[in-house]
Design a protein with these regions (language model features):
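Short hydrophobic beta-strand motif reused across regulatory alpha/beta modules
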Residues: 183, 387, 489-497, 549-558
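Short beta-strands and strand-coil junctions in structured, solvent-facing domains, enriched
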Residues: 418, 536-537, 548
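Post-kinase regulatory C-tail/linker adjacent to protein kinase catalytic domains
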Residues: 429, 569-574
Length: 574
């Protein structure tokens, strides 16, 4: 009876401690991310206003010189970004792909120095006029904060919960969309649902939105609450043009990927690449300023039906290509805001074509459908994309129409490109998160962790009688023929030794090409090798030198596999 009461008390204490931890973590991240997200947005707006208006006014520049300001500002931004690379020791920029990867590892911590440096670089890029976004860097900042706090607190809550709180808080504050923040964190980053994670993540998202409204006011990006679209017209158009938006998303992602690949393959210095991007973007921006920066102002104009058809097509193509150029060549930033812009421009353009050709006048609804469809396909989060539209517009009919475009566009982009832009980034690094946490854990667990020295080694000068004696003494049925330097020469088994003449050379009767595992193999690779194996043990060999490191057996492999699977299950289902 006493033990039963103790268990009840311990269970109650555990429940209250988890509740308190979830509340504290959620509120803490909500407050921090509301400050950081709004601070980032306000800073970019201030820098944009400085670039577009204040510098020319304060310096009294004439019109010809002021027209060149986009070019000068981008050159200055490129210079500052190079300094950020040097100070923070950044060899490559970090973003949401790294957040996804970190959330799929049970023992991984994000590089906080490079994470914060990447966010600062994105702020400089967007403020300087580069055609990049803000939400990706904010998402990664939230994930980096989560990883850092987890280290400080010594892991009283798992890393994925901290990362989820940071990500949800960033989205909720950035879009004033707390529900979308919760959905995005689970759908795009964590990719699993557990009762342990949902409470702190929801608290972080809702509190981040609340703190943002209380401290910075309610400034929705879009306001279509007064517009009620005709669903009988909009829904068929949304369904019809969904694949078109999916194709636009694929072209957008391919352009960025090819730009990154070109920059990585060429032998140009980072400074040359980034200044070239600044030159091209700034020159184009002198004549088409709508493609510079985050594009929030032009986005509103597009959704309100502004710009001529030809100019709309120009800024659509220009934004797509310049975003690829900037991100690929070092003017780092996010892809989500440009995807919103490209999608809205594509939706508005096809909406006008449909109105002219087939008489389907969908108004701003098709532009919103395109915006949601392209952005959702790029980030690989269709449900979160629909929720963002719903919470930004507060219009159920538009969200319903957007859902049709989102799901059809996502199917097309998934078939032609992949799950998301971030998944493809990870695949290019040899990481397939679609296989799940278990696969990643097995790929990152070295087989050397379970290598044993419990094997019988036979010297190349020894004879058959000595080999038999060693096998019997060690109670083994297999032995390994080794050189004086430990190089594996072959594998012997008891049956072969007994069935051959005693005077026969051991090397001639040994299996000279036995099944082996390379010393730097992962658990996943070792299991794949062992699937075709029948015997006592498998040698682990350094392929460069031929030296035998030890052996593994099937029992050890599967014990480690089950241990990893149990840990992943606890993480995803608890």
């Amino acid at each position: 009876m006493i033990d039963y009461e103790k268990r009840r008390i311990n269970k109650a204490l555990t429940m209250f401690s988890q509740l308190f931890a979830g509340l504290a973590v959620g509120l803490g991240f909500g407050f921090v991310m509301s400050i950081v997200s709004n601070g980032f947005v306000i800073s970019v707006r201030w820098l944009t206003d400085l670039r577009e208006v204040r510098i020319a006014y304060l310096l009294g520049l004439d019109q010809q010189i002021a027209a060149l300001l986009p070019l000068f500002c981008l050159f200055f931004a490129a210079f500052l970004i190079l300094q950020v690379r040097r100070v923070f020791g950044i060899d490559r920029w970090h973003g949401p792909a790294d957040s996804i990867y970190a959330a799929h590892r049970t023992d991984n911590e994000l590089d906080t120095r490079k994470g914060f440096g990447s966010t600062l670089a994105a702020l400089i890029s967007a403020g300087g006029g580069a055609s990049v976004g803000q939400y990706g860097p904010l998402v990664h900042f939230g994930a980096t904060m989560g990883s850092l706090v987890r280290t400080w607190t010594r892991g009283f809550v798992t890393t994925d919960v901290f990362i989820g709180c940071g990500v949800a808080g960033a989205i909720a504050a950035g879009f004033n969309a707390p529900i979308a923040g919760v959905v995005f964190a689970h759908e795009a980053i964590l990719r699993h649902f557990s009762m342990r994670a949902i409470a702190p993540i929801a608290i972080a998202s809702i509190s981040s939105s609340w703190f943002s409204q209380q401290l910075f006011g309610n400034n929705p990006l879009l306001d279509f609450t007064s517009i009620v679209p005709d669903l009988s017209v909009v829904l068929p158009a949304a369904l019809l043009f969904g694949p078109v938006f999916g194709f636009v998303a694929v072209v957008f992602m391919i352009a960025i990927r090819k730009s990154l690949q070109f920059a990585g393959a060429c032998d140009w210095a980072p400074s040359r690449l980034i200044f070239l991007a600044a030159l091209i973007t700034g020159t184009f921006g002198i004549f088409v300023p709508e493609v510079l920066g985050l594009g929030s102002g032009p986005l509103r104009v597009i959704l309100d039906g502004g710009y001529s058809d030809s100019y709309l097509l120009l800024i659509l193509v220009g934004k797509l290509l310049l975003t690829a150029l900037c991100i690929g060549f070092g003017l780092f930033g996010g892809v989500f805001s440009p995807a919103l812009f490209v999608g809205a421009a594509a939706g508005a353009f096809v909406g006008r074509i449909s109105a002219t050709v087939v008489g389907i006048a969908a108004g701003p609804a098709l532009a919103i459908c395109g915006m949601a469809a392209v952005a959702s396909a790029v980030i690989g989060a269709p449900i979160a994309g629909v929720m963002i539209v719903l919470e930004m517009t507060m219009n159920y009919q538009m969200a319903l129409a957007a859902m049709l475009s989102v799901v059809t566009a996502s199917i097309i982009s998934h078939l032609l490109y992949g799950h998301s832009f971030f998944d493809r980034q990870l695949l290019d690094r040899g990481i397939d998160v679609a296989q799940g946490r278990g696969h990643i854990e097995m790929m990152e667990t070295p087989v050397l962790d379970i290598v044993s020295d419990d094997f019988v080694g036979i010297g190349e000068a020894e004879v058959q009688a000595q080999a038999l004696e060693k096998l019997v003494s060690a109670n083994h049925s297999e032995a390994y023929l080794l050189s004086d330097h430990g190089v594996l020469l072959g594998k012997l088994n008891l049956q072969t030794l007994l069935s051959n003449e005693a005077k026969q050379d051991l090397f001639t009767i040994a299996d000279q090409a036995p099944l082996s595992i390379k010393h730097d193999a992962s658990l996943q690779q070792a299991i794949e090798v062992a699937s075709d194996f029948v015997g006592e043990s498998i040698p682990v060999v350094d392929r460069a030198t031929g030296i035998m490191q030890g052996v593994v057996n099937e029992a050890d492999l599967f014990k480690l596999y089950l241990k990893l699977q149990s840990r992943v299950t606890d993480l995803e289902r608890s």
